[in-house]
Amino acid sequence: MHANAAGHCIDATKLDELHRYANAELASIDFNSNMYDVDFERLAADKDIIQLVFDVAQHEDVWGTGCPEPKIHIKDLNFNHNDIQIMGKNKDTVKITKFGVSYMKFHAKDLIEELGQHTEIKMNIVGKMNLNEYFGNVTPQIFIDSYDIMDGNLAF
């Protein structure tokens, strides 16, 4: 035995009833929503993300019909309000900078509202990699397509 172990059992004669119940209750759920085919997966603190963005950006002329732009899944991006900038004419663009990478979301009123509900934030992100060049400075960016937010104070 080990701590927090749990188990359940069901009488074999009740399996058909369980299947009918589960099928009825879960029929309206699309289990493929929020599913993404990603090409890369990294923890936010992984040191190779910057180089990966530079490497992928070298091939940006390849993406198009029949060759989709690669996506990356970033796990465990932990940050606070000091790492966030709200930008743009309409103040609806979010820029989160952490570990030398800028995570960008445009038209992000909902995200801005969600971020305001927490002091410490943990996010998982799916996005596309990009390089931003501004006055000779090149910054690796990830444009956020989808995200999950958790209260960073409760995450471990």
List each language-model region with its residue ranges.
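Acidic, two-metal ion nucleic-acid-processing modules in DNA metabolism proteins
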Residues: 1-156
